[in-house]
Curated annotation (Swiss-Prot):
Record-given protein name: Alanine--tRNA ligase
GO cellular-component term (any): cytosol
NCBIfam families documented for this protein: alaS (TIGR00344)
Matching SUPFAM superfamilies: Class II aaRS and biotin synthetases, Putative anticodon-binding domain of alanyl-tRNA synthetase (AlaRS), ThrRS/AlaRS common domain, Translation proteins
Pfam families (UniProt xref): DHHA1, tRNA-synt_2c, tRNA_SAD
Function: Catalyzes the attachment of alanine to tRNA(Ala) in a two-step reaction: alanine is first activated by ATP to form Ala-AMP and then transferred to the acceptor end of tRNA(Ala). Also edits incorrectly charged Ser-tRNA(Ala) and Gly-tRNA(Ala) via its editing domain.
GO terms of molecular function: alanine-tRNA ligase activity; aminoacyl-tRNA deacylase activity; ATP binding; tRNA binding; zinc ion binding
One GO BP annotation of this record: alanyl-tRNA aminoacylation
Binding site residues for Zn(2+): H561, H565, C663, H667
Spans through the membrane: none
Cofactor: Zn(2+)
Keyword Aminoacyl-tRNA synthetase part of the UniProt annotation: yes
Domain notes: Consists of three domains; the N-terminal catalytic domain, the editing domain and the C-terminal C-Ala domain. The editing domain removes incorrectly charged amino acids, while the C-Ala domain, along with tRNA(Ala), serves as a bridge to cooperatively bring together the editing and aminoacylation centers thus stimulating deacylation of misacylated tRNAs.
Amino acid sequence: MSAKKLTGNEIRKKFLSFYAQREHTILPSASLVPEDPTVLLTIAGMLPFKPIFLGQQPRQYPRATTSQKCIRTNDIENVGRTARHHTFFEMLGNFSFGDYFKPEAIALAWELSTKIFALPPERLVVSVFREDDEAFAIWRDQIGIPAHRIQRMDEADNFWASGPTGPCGPCSEIYYDFHPELGDDHIDLEDDTRFIEFYNLVFMQYNRDANGNLTPLENRNIDTGMGLERMAQILQKVPNNYETDLIFPIIKTASDIADIDYRKSDDKTKVSLKVIGDHVRAVANLIADGVTASNVGRGYILRRLIRRVVRHGRLIGISGEFTSKVAETAITLAEDIYPNLRERETVIKAELQREESRFLETLERGEKLLAEIMAKPETKKTQHISGEDAFKLYDTYGFPLELTQEIAEENGLTVDVSMFDQEMKLAQIRSQSAHETIDLTAQDGVKLDIDKTQFLGYTDLSSPAQVMALVGDGEQLETVQAGAQVQIVLDKTPFYAESGGQIADRGYLSGDSLVVRIEDVQKQNNIFVHFGRIERGRLQLGMTVNAQIDGTCRRRAQANHTATHLLQAALRSLVDSSISQAGSLVSFDRLRFDFNCPRGLKPEEVEQVEAQVNSWIAEAHSATVAEMPLEVAKAKGAVAMFGEKYADVVRVVDYPGVSMELCGGTHVNNTAEIGVFKIISEAGISSGVRRIEAVAGLAVLDYLKVRDAVVKELSDRFKAKPEELSERVSNLQQELKDSQKQLEALKGELAVAKSDQLLGNAETVGEFQILVAEMPGVDAEALKTAAERLQQKLDESAVVLGSAAEGKVSLVAAFSKSVNGKGLQAGKFIGGIAKICGGGGGGRPNLAQAGGRDPSKLKEALESAKEQLVDGLK
């Protein structure tokens, strides 16, 4: 019997169907961004079920089966170098929650492997935990595997635990033997050239206490995992996971862009292609699941993966941007099982292009400096890059330590990581010492043992309240006199504490001859701390005061907060349904809304969004506010802030048919109370994050007053009526544009004149004319015009021109088709030459442009170009 050759999609489908037919509920893959706060990413198929295994959540079904997307980066350096290491992989799994156990799990796994996937039994070897006699007996007596093909393994290999204490149990693994001809005399499962582990069965049957004692669990569970990529390698009979149909099409796209043949490539090139194939799957799925590149957490993992893709692309000769092209292949391969890939295609490609463009600039600077560091005599002597140099690359140029280590390793060098860490700590200390910090919390040197504050502000603007604590200068106080600043805790309060982007209420505390102005309110552990100044009288611990918020400020904040909700709803409706909030500020005079979006909004889109918000305001939608379980709120479609952790019971602010969000802020009862809404600006603030600033309600009048003053000043300056200003500015812009065109035309004519003088410098090489020359002070566009003209005049020829101006280098190559026929492509040729000047570029086979950052290297670059042309055209 021989194994059936199946596609990756067929393997996944057969696995899930097999278990579905055996009463398992098929569940969709969970997001790569887990709900478990202890891990950054979903690293295993069982992670979504961890709360059930740990007894923290009740089971909803006795059996389940999934194809779970996972990411692990702990051994990223092995990706592409071994046959089966990956960052992104799919784990096929079947799970039992207190239902079937060891005998059934083993029998099902064997039936699936030998009947459905038709793996020859004589090619399978299994492992068990050394003390698991029960599993050994099941494999031998019930399944019929010879005892010598059942390997007993140590705890490190075949015993699973969720931590030092808690549920745990032995494992059993199934291995495929690629070389049965070697016989069974010496079976070494660590020989990964012969054996591949493709199915792991975890039998959770014990609870481990703090003393290490094991006691049987009342409800025993099964957790299994089959690597989809590994099973594909086995069934498709390819030498490694990368050459399966799950990954190889991505590799093929990358190799086509690089114009190389994977099959004929050397090992180093194949490693780079495999890294690209693996990492592109990872980054596409991460972005699809809402991760954006950053310098912290999972955002840093994404950024690191993208940068590795870019760098390995350069290693195989790709000089321009390419990541979005290979991502398209990754999306096409997996969109049927993970539809959010196609839904978020625009976001994925935009994020890749943005990160790639930025990193290419970083690479150009960093690689040049790193090359200089590696060329230093002391580096060559010690075969070691100092921590100081590595940190300078990181701190000054944004060059990642991991990348420095990779390049160093490729050149036979090491990096002093411990010294790098010391430099990092020193930098942090320097940064901290450059700032003074003031702790404004009531717990500054004071431990307050009091009950949480009762918040009344959703319904009441004033309320009597008892003073529970007074804090000043780091001490608890009993009495505070007029003129003093103090932090006050009340038993209940109508004051909204700053949270969720909304600033705190302002107002007063009052009593007999007492007035306390409240300037801020902060909240810690549900204790509201009022920051106030005693304007008159004396405030005492335990006294009763009247807490009164400023109604005008509250109404302004409410209008701006509700307008923020309407703004998000309009953006999701009119621009992109995947838009999510990245931050906000709701104050009395304005609002600011930050949101994840891969592109800037068009002017007409801004107008449409503003019009939609004003339309909803005019329609007078009433608010419905309710508390409900989080899952119920999500099921109703309530919008939550991505990455935010919510309590089991949440507050939902709903303007039916318009906006429904999880929110603890204060809002208008009816949208008509807002009055009017005006967008002031829309701009990018960081990679993939946009910001809209706007005003609502009475704040719009303040904004219009300022704008009218500006218009009046411009009218006076241009001596024009306000309605004539646009035409007057347009005329000035057109005059400037015409002048610039005339200047460019003159530059072009000058370049042509100069180029005609160079014709006599052309040299004959075989049947071709070659001309390599510098044209000082000529810009890139004029240089291109000159190169094309010279190539046409010289006919069968190769022309390379260079120019240095304003600290930059411009290079152009123009080749005739006959030169292309000799294997010389202008795009690749000029890209290689530009590297000498610390730059890069590319283009078509017959015409290409490049740039560089080091004018001092231009002469060397042109000399190299001439030598290469002579050698290539002989």
